[in-house]
Every structure is written in structure tokens, then in C-alpha cells.
Amino acid sequence: MASPRTVTVVALSVALGLFFVFMGTIKLTPRLSKDAYSEMKRAYKSYVRALPLLKKMGINSILLRKSIGALEVACGIVMTLVPGRPKDVANFFLLLLVLAVLFFHQLVGDPLKRYAHALVFGILLTCRLLIARKPEDRSSEKKSSPPGNAGSDGNAGNTEEQPSLYEKAPQGKMKLS
């Protein structure tokens, strides 16, 4: 049976991957939703107007929208279907994209309800990346005393564990005044 951590990472990967494939497709084509597609076109025009540096670099709203949409679709497919390290790389790129989108929303002065989904999915991407990259639990490994920390009798090879602070603390009720 898979560990809860593995189930969580797989569930987040598939859900986030499908979401970004869907959102990227909406940016690329009106076939899924004409209203959402036209709204994306309008939003990306305002992003390019608010950031003149993009125009100076030769990036128009169509190129920006299609580039971000294609990157979302590609990373979403990787998040959904490809195992291992590429999934974490796609997660990282999507996280950078979400941060860029949040920046654009702030730049044009959009209200929170227009970009709340980006905040939520940014948090989910961060959680997925942290869970996936967290080292395995090492509670089964034996704890060893740090080097140079000899026991009271001077034996460096003393492997007895020191009691934790919790075990040393007095147990029972405390009087607070």
C-alpha cells in the first residue's frame, strides 16, 4: 500500500496538472469557452499596456498569452503524466508562472476576486513541491551522539541516548499566579 505522502503528491500532481492543462488551453483556443477566451485576450492586453517594457522587448499581448498558455499546457501534461524529477521541475515553472500572473494582476489593479484562484493554486503548488521534496522520515534510524560529545566517564563510544528535554521536565500540575 502506498504511503499517505505518496497518495497526496500523486493526487496534487494530477489535479494541478489537469487544472493547468485546462487553463492553458483556454488561453490558446476559444473551443472550450468563447467567453473565457475573450476575457483572457482582454486581460493580457491590459497586462502589456501596464508594462511598457514588454512592448519594448517586442512582446505583444498575443505572444504573451500564447506563450504562457503553451507553458501551462506543457507543464500540466508533465505534472499529470511524467513521473520523477521532471514533475518537480514543471511544478517549479508553474509556480514561477503563478507569481508572474499575481504580479500582473497587482500591476493592473485587479480586485482580489479576479486573482484569488491564482493565490490558491500558488499555495497548492508550493505545498506539493514541499511535500515531494521533503526528505524521508528518519525516525527508524538510530540516533547517534554528536562527535566529540563524550559521556560523563569520558568514553567517546558511549551510545546511550540522552533523555529529551520533555523527559527531564517535571510532570504534573503547575501553579500559575
Curated annotation (Swiss-Prot):
The gene is TMEM35A. It comes from the Eukaryota. GO terms for molecular function: acetylcholine receptor regulator activity. Residues 27-61, 110-114 are lumenal. This is Novel acetylcholine receptor chaperone. Residues 1-5, 83-88, 133-177 are cytoplasmic. The keyword Transmembrane helix applies. InterPro entries: TMEM35A/B (IPR040399). Residues 43-54 are annotated as: Interaction with NGFR. Molecular chaperone which mediates the proper assembly and functional expression of the nicotinic acetylcholine receptors (nAChRs) throughout the brain. Essential for the proper folding, assembly, function and surface trafficking of alpha-7 (CHRNA7), alpha-4-beta-2, alpha-3-beta-2 and alpha-3-beta-4 receptors. Stably associates with ribophorin-1 (RPN1) and ribophorin-2 (RPN2) (components of the oligosaccharyl transferase (OST) complex) and with calnexin (CANX), both of which are critical for NACHO-mediated effects on CHRNA7 assembly and function. It is found in: Peroxisome membrane; Cytoplasmic vesicle; Endoplasmic reticulum membrane. GO terms for biological process: chaperone-mediated protein complex assembly; positive regulation of protein localization to cell surface. Its main location: membrane.
